[in-house]
């Protein structure tokens, strides 16, 4: 009875161990591949719990999401014979799920060592061997990342389709201490040169600013002077216009005054001409004789009145004609002057 219990206990333990080894879990973002007797099985499994034959079947979980492989301490010899070391090179990649079986079959589950690590060493050594230390360390360093990515992806497209390189990051290489100090000194001098150049640019900028300020100030003064000059010109033109208006008004007044005087003289002349009749002249003669205080005696006194009446009348008529002619000519001359 005791032996039976021992057998049952051993059988139960074996069953539990078999069950425990048969059940396995695949994490999200991974694909499970299976080996039986060392041979890779064609079947794969996704995330979750799965069963397999215990003891004779084993599995490996292959990541299909983005992962970063680090390649450390990669030696590299330049074309000048200087040995440098890259401390760390990071390769970001991912595996397409449907390509897991083919890649694991051809390159094992540790495919990254064969496809990525070895390729990084090879490409870096080829790059360094055709470039100088100056080019690798400074001039072409920014191109190493992209060149490595393109070279890796080109080979993987033909050798392992489904393995995609997302990015490559390369750290600054370690160079011999003496050379590094020279580069640091060179960078220091270059920095000083850049600082001096920037100071010169600042001085030039300040001078340019001062020049622009002076130019703006001169333009402002010129504009003010131009405006002032324009105001003075306008004032002079206004004064000239006012003077012309006053002169025109004065000339009009004088002309009107002269016309009035001429008209008055003409009317007086016409009135005088109308008065110079023989009867009026005879009357004026009698008044003149009557007002004369001297008295003449003699026999010719009556004849004097008779004979002289005609002569005096003719004289007064001639005088009136001359006066009328002169008065008529004066308006014409005044009109011609106007």
UniProtKB/Swiss-Prot annotation:
Q: Which organism is it from?
A: Bos taurus (Bovine)
Record-annotated membrane-spanning stretches: 4-24
A single Gene Ontology MF term assigned here is: ubiquitin protein ligase binding
* Keyword Transmembrane part of the UniProt annotation: yes
SMART domains for this protein = PHB (SM00244)
The protein here is known as: Erlin-2
Q: List the Lumenal topological domains.
A: 25-338
Q: What does the record note on quaternary structure?
A: Forms a heteromeric complex with ERLIN1. In complex with ERLIN1, interacts with RNF170. Interacts with activated ITPR1, independently of the degree of ITPR1 polyubiquitination. Interacts with SCAP, INSIG1, SREBF1 and SREBF2 under cholesterol sufficiency conditions; indicative for an association with the SCAP-SREBP-INSIG complex. Probably part of an AMFR/gp78 and INSIG1-containing ubiquitin ligase complex involved in ERAD of HMGCR. Interacts with TMUB1; TMUB1 bridges the association with AMFR. Interacts with SYVN1 and RNF139. Interacts with TMEM259. Interacts with TMEM41B.
Query: Which residues lie within the region annotated Interaction with ERLIN1?
Result: 177-309
The protein's role, per its UniProt record: Component of the ERLIN1/ERLIN2 complex which mediates the endoplasmic reticulum-associated degradation (ERAD) of inositol 1,4,5-trisphosphate receptors (IP3Rs) such as ITPR1. Promotes sterol-accelerated ERAD of HMGCR probably implicating an AMFR/gp78-containing ubiquitin ligase complex. Involved in regulation of cellular cholesterol homeostasis by regulation the SREBP signaling pathway. May promote ER retention of the SCAP-SREBF complex.
Membrane topology value: Single-pass type II membrane protein
Please report the PTM annotation for this entry: Deubiquitinated by USP25; leading to stabilization.
Q: Which gene encodes it?
A: ERLIN2
């Amino acid at each position: 009875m005791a032996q039976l219990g021992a057998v049952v206990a051993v059988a139960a333990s074996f069953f539990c161990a078999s069950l425990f080894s048969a059940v396995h879990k695949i994490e999200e973002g991974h694909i499970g591949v299976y080996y039986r007797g060392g041979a890779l099985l064609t079947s794969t499994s996704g995330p979750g719990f799965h069963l397999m034959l215990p003891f004779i079947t084993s599995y490996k979980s292959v990541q299909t999401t983005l992962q970063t492989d680090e390649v450390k301490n990669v030696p590299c010899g330049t074309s000048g014979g200087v040995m440098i070391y890259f401390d760390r090179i990071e390769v970001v990649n991912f595996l397409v799920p449907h390509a897991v079986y083919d890649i694991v079959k051809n390159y094992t589950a540790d495919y990254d060592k064969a496809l990525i690590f070895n390729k990084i060493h090879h490409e870096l050594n080829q790059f360094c061997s055709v470039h100088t230390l100056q080019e690798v360390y400074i001039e072409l360093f920014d191109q190493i990342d992209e060149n490595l990515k393109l070279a890796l992806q080109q080979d993987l497209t033909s050798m392992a389709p489904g393995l995609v390189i997302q990015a490559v990051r390369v750290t600054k290489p370690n160079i011999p201490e003496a050379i590094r100090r020279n580069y640091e000194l060179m960078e220091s001098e270059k920095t000083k040169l850049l600082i001096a150049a920037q100071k010169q640019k600042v001085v030039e900028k300040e001078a340019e600013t001062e020049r622009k300020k002076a130019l703006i100030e001169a333009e402002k003064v010129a504009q003010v002077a131009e405006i002032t000059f324009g105001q003075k010109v306008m004032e002079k033109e206004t004064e000239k216009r006012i003077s012309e208006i006053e002169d025109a008004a004065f000339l009009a007044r004088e002309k009107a005054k002269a016309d009035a005087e001429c008209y008055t003289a003409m009317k007086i002349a016409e009135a005088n001409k109308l008065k110079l009749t023989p009867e009026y002249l005879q009357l004026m003669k009698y008044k003149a004789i009557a007002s004369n205080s001297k008295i003449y005696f003699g026999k010719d006194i009556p004849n004097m009145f008779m004979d002289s009446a005609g002569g005096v009348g003719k004289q007064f008529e001639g005088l009136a004609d001359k006066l009328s002619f002169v008065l008529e000519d004066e308006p014409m001359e005044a009109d011609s002057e106007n």
